[in-house]
A protein has these predicted regions:
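Sec-exported extracytoplasmic/periplasmic mature domains
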Residues: 22, 26-33, 93, 97, ...
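Active-site His/acidic residue clusters
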Residues: 1-19, 23
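Metal-dependent active-site segment of extracytoplasmic phospho-/sulfohydrolases and closely related
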Residues: 16-57
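Short catalytic/ligand-binding loop motif for oxyanion handling, primarily in non-cytosolic enzymes
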Residues: 1, 48-51, 131-133
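…; additionally, a secondary subgroup of soluble metalloenzymes is captured
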Residues: 178, 182-206
Length: 206
């Protein structure tokens, strides 16, 4: 969070990690069991540069005492008092750099389902915007995550190699929920019901 994705700090960190991985694999290749080991290198999410001029504090638009609970950040879930839901929705529709949905209108791509704990209003900031609902000062960081999971900036990395995996297979994109299925298969475990795609996962394995 302290550096933007395209900063010299991030570049030097990636180069440092690359050297560490190079040393790791060089030593791993000396092992008699190297050809039996599966390796996975991954990240949990992408990062996007935060632009302070796009900062949005919902405290400037909505009365705090009209909500029973607020889970703020990227995204923000609002739990307004029943008599205030419609008013809050109308106000949020006019706030720049954010999109708001009622609970029953949240796009399926976010996979929120119908859980009763979901806030009555789901507020998602644009890429590069940070959202808060609190009186204190603005956040101090250079980048963050949690935006639309279909945005390229939010894509993670995934590399796999070893006897279990096919060679030279490249997927255009893969949901991180598939990691559970991948690891379960490597460990020969029966996965519990989940949101992963077994068809996509099968394309990676021999």
């Amino acid at each position: 969070h302290k550096a933007t994705p395209d900063s010299s700090t991030t570049l030097s960190t990636v180069e440092h990690l690359d050297r560490i991985l190079g040393d790791f694999f060089a030593k791993a290749r000396r092992l008699d069991i190297f050809d039996l080991i599966d390796f996975i290198v991954l990240s949990d999410h992408g990062m996007a540069t935060y632009y302070p001029e796009n900062y949005v504090n919902l405290n400037d638009y909505l009365p705090r005492d009209s909500f029973d609970y607020v889970f703020d950040g990227v995204p923000t879930l609002l739990y307004p008092k029943p008599t205030y839901t419609d008013s809050a929705y109308a106000i949020l529709k006019c706030v720049p750099h954010v999109t708001v949905w009622r609970k029953n209108e949240i796009p399926e791509k976010f996979v929120y389902g119908k859980n009763p704990r979901i806030g009555d209003l789901f507020v998602l900031p644009d890429i590069g915007t940070y959202l808060q609902f609190r009186p204190e000062s603005r956040p101090i960081f250079a980048a963050t995550h949690g935006y639309d999971n279909f945005a390229p900036e939010m894509e993670a990395i995934f590399y796999a190699a070893g006897p279990s995996f096919k060679q030279n297979v490249e997927l255009p994109v893969m949901a991180n929920v598939n990691l559970y299925l991948i690891i379960a298969r490597l460990l020969d475990l029966q996965p519990a019901p989940n949101d992963g795609d077994s068809v996509v996962v099968s394309t990676l394995f021999r």
